[in-house]
Amino acid sequence: MLKKYIIITGSIAALMGIVVFINSQITDSVTQLPNPNIEQSDKINGQVPPNTPTKTMFESRLLTQDILDDRGEPTGWTIVTSRSVRDKGTRSPIHVHPHGGQTCVVSGEMSLYLDNEPDIQKAGPGECYWMPAGRRMSGVNSADSRTIMIDTFVVPKGDQVWIVVEPGMKDAQDQFDKLFHTHK
């Protein structure tokens, strides 16, 4: 069991080293403001995604856990997981993740609109999709009902999990900050 834990921890640490470099290209590490090179836009691949951009209806944090190295010492990284409910006919504001993450659908259906990706990724109950770091995206509720999903991110302790880049939607920025940005 300890060997498995060490392998998992080592793999996460290596991945996070790569993510740190990517993060430095997305946000200013002091202010956490979007890098001016990230386009502020209401479009993905030249088109406005379907549905109305909103905050989710409900968010609850399920897990906040510091990641430890093989000696049991904190690595400076934290895994955070939340459960959210998105109403039918809505979508997330266009945003960027400084560090990648995944969404797993419990009920309903989500469609990921991802910049520079012509195919829309759909996930139904029991399915997940990956949200890569540094790319503009929007999660669209493509079901005829509310959708319940679980989001998981591994981030440097105290970092944001997303940066809203859709004009007029800056008030949605604190949607996750209240859940995730308080894990300092």
Listing of model-derived features with the role each one plays in the protein:
Residues 83, 102, 119-121:
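Short, surface-exposed secondary-structure edge patches
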Residues 117-134:
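Short acidic-glycine-tyrosine-enriched beta hairpin
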Residues 1-12:
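N-terminal Sec-pathway targeting helices
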Residues 74-77, 89-104:
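A short beta-loop-beta micro-motif enriched in histidine and acidic residues
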Residues 144-161:
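A short hydrophobic beta-strand segment most commonly corresponding to one strand
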Residues 8, 20-78, 122, 165-184:
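A short, N-terminal "cap"/entry segment at the start of jelly-roll beta-barrel domains
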Residues 98-117:
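Glycine- and acidic-residue-biased ligand/ion/polar-headgroup-sensing regions
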Residues 94, 112-113, 131, 136-143:
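Short beta-strand His + acidic residue motifs that chelate non-heme Fe in jelly-roll/DSBH
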